[in-house]
Regions:
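Active-site catalytic pocket residues across diverse enzymes, especially alpha/beta-hydrolases
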Residues: 44, 119, 175-179
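Short secondary-structure boundary/capping segments
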Residues: 20, 42, 67, 123-125, ...
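Class I SAM-dependent methyltransferase SAM-binding "motif I" and its flanking Rossmann-like core
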Residues: 11, 82-85, 89-155, 195-203
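Structural motif
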Residues: 32-33, 54-55, 137-138, 162-166
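A generic local structural motif
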Residues: 14-18, 37-38, 62-64, 120-121, ...
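Class I S-adenosyl-L-methionine
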Residues: 1-109, 114
Length: 206
């Protein structure tokens, strides 16, 4: 059995109780490199085999999963945040389906919620916004045209924008072009809830 487990947003104690117990029971753990707090690996039992997926190809990850299944070992695939958000789990699940290997998912706390907690803010304020849009700027992974920053900005709902810190000037321009007022409150949060977290309050323009 393979378990896709969300490691949470950063702080080791923000993993779910279920996620912690799965780590304690695992015979094999494949974790997402530096994106996952290494303190979480302390939950693993002494005999657990641990692999860093940052140094592995998808084929190598799947090979470990298949070997574990054949040996009747329980495997945890430890992803950052919540596996369902930018976790690239679908391609792994498709291959597991093809191989006939069963799997389950355990949710985690995503970065946008860790950031909100660090800033003591609420995304859904009566009279301002009752919706939260989770999106990203286009990088190596293409974003459908209908999901452009401008089209989402037109709703003027709260937005959590991932994987985009290297494109802040362009992001600001596109948010304003889409409909946000220049003075709309904004924040930049790096490594939310980690010990070296950095957070900056600003506006959409700045």
């Amino acid at each position: 059995m393979v378990y896709f487990v969300g490691a949470g947003t950063g702080a080791a104690d923000l993993i779910t109780v279920r996620g912690m117990r799965l780590l304690e029971q695992a015979d094999v753990i494949i974790y997402a490199g530096s994106l996952v707090n290494p303190e979480l690996l302390a939950y693993a039992k002494k005999e657990c085999e641990i692999f860093n997926s940052a140094t592995m190809t998808l084929s190598e990850v799947l090979a470990v999963m298949q070997q574990s299944q054949e040996a009747e070992k329980m495997l945890v695939r430890l992803h950052t945040g919540d596996p369902s958000i930018y976790g690239a789990i679908r391609e792994q699940m498709d291959e597991l389906d093809r191989l006939g290997i069963p799997y389950e998912s355990c949710p985690g706390v995503s970065a946008c919620f860790g950031a909100a907690a660090s800033l003591n803010i609420e995304y859904t304020l009566p009279g301002i916004s009752q919706s939260l849009i989770i999106t990203r700027m286009e990088g190596k992974t293409k974003v459908p045209t209908k999901e452009s920053i401008e089209s989402f900005a037109a709703h003027q709902a709260s937005m959590a924008i991932y994987l985009s810190t290297g494109m802040l000037e362009e992001l600001s321009q596109r948010l304003i072009a889409g409909g946000y007022e220049k003075h709309t409150p904004a924040a930049l949060v790096y490594k939310a809830t980690w010990k070296d977290e950095e957070a900056y309050l600003c506006t959409v323009e700045t």
